[in-house]
Amino acid sequence: MASTTALPPTVGFDLDMTLIDSRPGIRACYQALSERTGTHIDADLAVTRLGPPLADELINWFPAERIDEVADLYRAMYPAYAIAATPALPGAREAMSAVREAGGRAVVVTAKHEPNARLHLAHLGIEPDAVIGDLWAEQKASALREHGAGVYVGDHVGDVRGARAADALSVAVATGPCDPAELREAGADVVLTDLTEFPGWLSDHMNGRDNGGRPGYSPAARA
């Protein structure tokens, strides 16, 4: 009988560019923010570097003393411009289902403003067991630990850092701004092309199978 690897009680997922393609909605919101404030924002450039907190992007376009004010305005405008325009990424629903079918729990831990994160998930019919927002990179470790996450899935090197800070397995998907080489260099344990590969990886992981030779999988040794 094959040996098995126990499923962690919880699998965490990032949101932007992991579960959802938020570029169209965020682009539309930045364009509307630019019109509202009379400040130039290169929305096409901004959506190429999603992941870090909103303030990290706004500082490129607004003086430091206006960041809090503009961030509040952006978040207030966001539901009208970003929710309907944002689709789920391929495999997002199936990845959540795979965790549940395996007897686990799925939680979303994201840097996005939590109320807006919840709006995205509700609009797309994706129902995690918990949603925790407003956490970036190593800050995510607190929520991952609180929920007992043994795996964290994300698209950014910041997500890799968050997983490692929580002593969780880092599963990276190359659907965001960071390419596979960057994700591996940051310390990702596994790099997938996208979430369509996640159910197969999860099955292999639970059953202790080595994925090293399987296309799309790139396990990296933990430091």
Please place each PLM-identified region on the residue numbering:
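Acidic, Mg2+-coordinating phosphoryl-transfer loop and its flanking beta/alpha structural elements
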Residues: 110, 153-196
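Non-catalytic pre-domain segments flanking phosphatase-related domains
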Residues: 1-13, 200-223
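N-terminal helical cap/lid subdomain that shapes the substrate entry/recognition surface
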Residues: 4-93, 102
